[in-house]
Amino acid sequence: MKSNQFLSVMLLCCVPILGIGQARSFRDFIVAASSPTNPKASETNFKNAGGTDRFLLSEWGKGWALSRGSEIVKEGYAFNFDFERNELYLRKDDEDVMIVADNNSVRRFVIANGTDSARFVKSIAIDKTNKVFFQLMGGSTSGKIALLKLRTSKALPVNKNDYARNVSGDYSTQYRSESVYYFVDSEIGVKGFEKMTRDELLKLFPQHQAIIVKLVTSKKNIDEKTLIAFTNEVNGL
């Protein structure tokens, strides 16, 4: 613990070169200068530690984070998200050190993912501790309906009797991801689900029957893309 505190103090010595707002945000985010991968945080570490089965990206990406004090950390920082630990990681461009953000100090954040971007928010309607980050898939937290996703990643036990592993000599940890979706609605409250059919969606939102019938043409489980389209159309997005 003392070593982490010392590292945090050393990092803070570099803060004056930033603007006052960014310096305060940077200070708020720092809780440790260690990481589950490697403190030197080269871009290959995420690949070696589970890749996109565990992290949002296999290397650092651009983005921004909004602190509890409504200050934005953006310029000069790289970001990634760990689905196993539900943690946001940052790296200051001119310092090869990974920083673990304090979930209590972060309100929301966005990380660029190819041509798209992943938006993460908190929802006290789902998580009373208000510490867990959910991916905002569709709609808006201030709109009629929001579609949130909680993705979790778990390490799988290594099978030393696996022939393929024995031949390759690769005993690295493998991960499995699972997702739970949530509709957060001002009228119905919160509805969590792993899968949903058209009939279930019609029962949940009978007032939006016209939109559902137009978008959902199969009685099978609705795919994520269609769930997002439904949520956005209800919100007029």
Residue spans for each PLM region:
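General N-terminal leader/first-domain-start detector
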Residues: K2-S3, I20-G76
